[in-house]
Amino acid sequence: MNFTKTDFVISMGMTIAVIFMSFTFPALGMTGDSVQENEIPEFNITKGSADFAREQPEYPARPSEGTLTYKNNSANWADGRQTYLQKGDTEYLVSFFDNSDNQNPPEWKLNLIKFNSSGSYSESTIITEGESKTLTSADGSYEIGFNNLEIEDSAVGNETASVDWKVLEQPSDSTWIGRLPVVGGLISGANQLASVVGWIGAIIWHFVVQILVTIGNTLLIFYNIFVYFLEFMYWITTAYSGVVAGAPTAWASVIVAIPGILLGFEFVKLVALAISLLPLT
């Protein structure tokens, strides 16, 4: 048994005829009830799909220098006006922004902030072109130097500038064993290595989860298409049955039913062919 080109043409033609009659005949008042828009199954290919909103784990190294850039009206701080020096239970952050509240000339402000469960502690200073400034965190752990302020635009609403920063002092291992010569370096190196290994594991898991979510969403797309096909077939069968039943005469019902009968034969043939291809038959 084969599903030939002729079978395909008949199936497509009769499907179009059934859909056409189901929509147009009632609308023209020839037979059946008019199709209501809210009765048509809604197709949502992404129904039930999962969102992958996890951020990629950051490398655990402590940055030692860089450039902060401020651009007024930039979205979500995407211009790079802040940088985390350290993340974890206690976090340190440097930030750079215009403190003049849209006044001209701008007043460029630097912040060094410490966050932990007890609260936040901020040290700040104003910097102008040609100046070098230093900020020390509230607990004395970090000392940051700032220089090379470059102002690209001072116009109100378009303030844009950048400044270079560099870590002059940063936290070290505070335990007595961590301060021992050689041993302290080994422990610090081991801790850093463990952090990097953990980061590699987190990166691998991040991509594994992303792949699993992608595969799951792809399978869900095919499932949604299949379910919609069944829902649409049920709806169109119901609508078409109403068209056939509402024909004004018996002969009209027979004529209107011909496309559905032919389509039914082709569908049965297709199902029989699919069953014959199963490995157990």
Swiss-Prot record:
It is found in: Virion. Keywords: Virion. Its main location: virion. It comes from the Viruses. GO terms for cellular component: virion component. Residues 8-28, 196-216, 219-239, 255-275 are annotated as: Hydrophobic. The virion does not contain any lipid membrane. This is Structural protein 26. It comes from His1 virus (isolate Australia/Victoria) (His1V).
